[in-house]
Regions:
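Preference for extracellular/luminal or secreted protein segments
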Residues: 1-37, 254-255, 273-361
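Enzymes and membrane/adaptor proteins characterized by extended Gly/Ser/Thr/Asp/Glu-rich
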Residues: 16, 24-25, 34-161, 180, ...
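A general structural motif
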Residues: 22-27, 203-217, 241-248, 252, ...
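Short helix-capping segments at alpha-helix termini
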Residues: 65-70, 169-173, 254-259, 313-316
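Phosphate/pyrophosphate-binding betaalpha-module
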Residues: 161-162, 166-178, 182, 191, ...
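Catalytic PLP-binding core of fold-type I/II PLP enzymes
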Residues: 249-262, 266
């Protein structure tokens, strides 16, 4: 791989709007130019990309065709309020209940089956990565961002149920992503808008927020998403966790022993974009120790900044190589590099899947 191609692997891009501002259902020249220019390691789909079954399958195939190294195709398919692919007249998908309801069942076998429903239906569209499950502990009733996206307010319950859902997603051949490290469950602010902080010490985090992530790592988690939350008692300032070397490298990589792929939360969110340029945010996150950059506000500017930082030595090339090795190893593990075919259409909204979700009260 050339240096330019290696840097491209660090990027996870999204294309939500057409040039006229309407939802992007049809692959267009603007998307093609960015994909061929950056050669990203992944592309994230949104509801704006979802119209019909055949439309979405074609859209994904065209994305794959523009990337010389097969990309991760990701989506937020958590269940409940966050499902980018929902049942419509044109898409007979299975609507999955909120994870809070799944946690309330107390049934870990059912939770794993729910993960299987989520993962297997994504394969129909060529999606190989699910930004789920939420591993946050819902410990602050004023937290409107997480709410019933979480499994429970009990850290051990979140640990058990999130690892079960991850296992189901994984068995379907899809990569689960544990989010939002080091825990977004005790915030009142919304990082989509601006800074949101968790005012806890590292010891307090270890007792609550980190419990599910520790369990996920022990169970073989391959990818972790780092949030943009601020941890003033840990960092001493408002630095987002996604740009904190102490959090990403010191805590997640070294103390907790995670050796998989670390990805940021979306870099176009207000907690980042209101305070950093796209290039600065990208470089700072890589310097903190992340492997992949999700949705920078300006993909080309972020790519150019990271490439320049590697060339200048501001980002060591050895670090770049280590990140690319992790990314490619994960793609290899899931058969992505050999080019996977689309999953069987019969999986979508199957009676077996409906029976599973019907068991969640």
């Amino acid at each position: 791989m050339t240096l330019e191609q290696k840097v491209g692997q660090l990027f996870f891009l999204a294309f939500r709007q057409d040039t006229d501002g309407t939802p992007l259902w049809t692959y267009n020249n603007a998307t093609d130019q960015v994909l061929r220019g950056v050669q990203p390691g992944g592309v994230c789909l949104f509801s704006e990309n979802v119209h019909t079954v055949n439309q979405l399958r074609t859209f994904v195939q065209k994305i794959q065709g523009a990337c010389s190294t097969p990309p991760f195709i990701g989506i937020d398919q958590e269940g409940g309020s966050v499902q980018r692919i929902r049942r419509t007249d044109a898409i007979p998908a299975t609507n999955v209940p909120a994870m809070w309801q799944v946690g309330q069942t107390g049934d870990l076998t059912l939770a794993e089956q729910i993960g299987g429903v989520l993962g297997s239906e994504l394969t129909v569209f060529g999606v190989n990565l699910d930004f789920a499950p939420v591993c946050d502990v819902f410990s602050n009733p004023k937290n409107t961002v997480i709410g019933h996206r979480a499994f429970s307010s009990d850290p051990q319950q979140v640990a058990r149920f999130s690892t079960a859902v991850s296992a189901g997603i994984r068995k379907a051949g899809v990569i689960p992503v544990c989010k939002h490290f080091p825990g977004h469950g005790d915030t009142t602010g919304d990082t989509h808008v601006d800074y949101a902080s968790v005012n806890k010490s590292l010891d307090e985090l270890r007792q609550t927020e980190l419990v599910p992530f520790r369990a996920q790592i022990q169970a073989g988690a391959e990818m972790v998403m780092v949030a943009h939350i601020s941890l003033p008692q840990v960092n001493g300032d408002d630095t987002p966790a996604s740009m904190s070397h102490r959090i990403v490298t010191g805590l997640l990589r070294q103390e907790m022993g995670f050796d998989g792929v670390i990805i940021t939360d979306a870099l176009d969110m207000g907690a980042v974009s209101a305070h950093y340029s796209a290039g600065e945010a990208a470089v700072r996150a890589i310097q903190a120790g992340v492997d992949m950059l999700l949705m920078p506000a300006d993909p080309r500017a972020a790519y150019d900044a990271v490439l320049a930082a590697v060339r200048s030595g501001e980002i060591p090339e050895a670090q770049l190589n280590a990140s690319v090795a992790r990314i490619l190893a994960l793609k290899q593990k899931y058969g992505i590099l050999s080019g996977k075919s689309l999953g069987d259409l019969s999986l979508l909204g199957s009676s077996a899947h409906q029976k599973v979700v019907n068991r969640v009260d």
